[in-house]
Amino acid sequence: FVHCDLQEVNLCDANLYTCKFILCCGLETAIVNDKTLYYRPQCPMNGSFIGYKGAWCYDPELHIRPVLVTLEIPADAYRSSATTRKCRCDKAIVLDAYTLSNGQQLPNTVPIHSAYDGCFVYTIGQTLQVVDCNTNRWDECSTGIHFFMEEEDARWWIESWINAYVL
C-alpha cells in the first residue's frame, strides 16, 4: 500500500502478513488486540536491547561481502516496527560485526556499509544517530536505522539483498 488513505477501510479478517504500508494515513487508530498479529511492535518499547542488522563491506579484493552487525539500541532511542519483523530506531551503538561467509569478526577499522545508503557507515564502538528518523511507525521503509530482533532475520535479509542487487 503506497500513499493510501485507510481511514475508512475495514481490514477485519484481512491477512496483511506480507503487506507494507508506505506513506499511508489513517493507521493511527488501528485496533491492537490478539487478532492483529504483527501490529504490536516487534521490539521492546522500553529499556535497551540487542538488534541485528544486515550490511556489507569490501573484502581485500574489493568484492562486496555480506556482514551481520550487532547493535545495542539504547533505552533513550526511538524504536518502532510496522506490520513485519523489520524494526527501526533513531540511535544505536555498534557492538560488533562479522562476515556471513566465514564468521570472521571484523576489526573496527573496516567500514561497514548500509545496504540502502552505502554512505551510511557502521563503525564498531561508535554510536550512530539519525536526526531525521521518521516517527510514524507505519512508514516501515522510512528514515532510521533498520534492524531485526533475530539474527536469522537479519542474515536472511542481507543475503537476499546481495543476491538481488549485487550478484
For each of these PLM feature ranges, what is it?
Residues F1-H63, R79:
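Tandem repeat scaffolds
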Residues F1-Q7, A154, S160-Y165:
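Extended, small-residue-rich solenoid/repeat segments and analogous flexible loops
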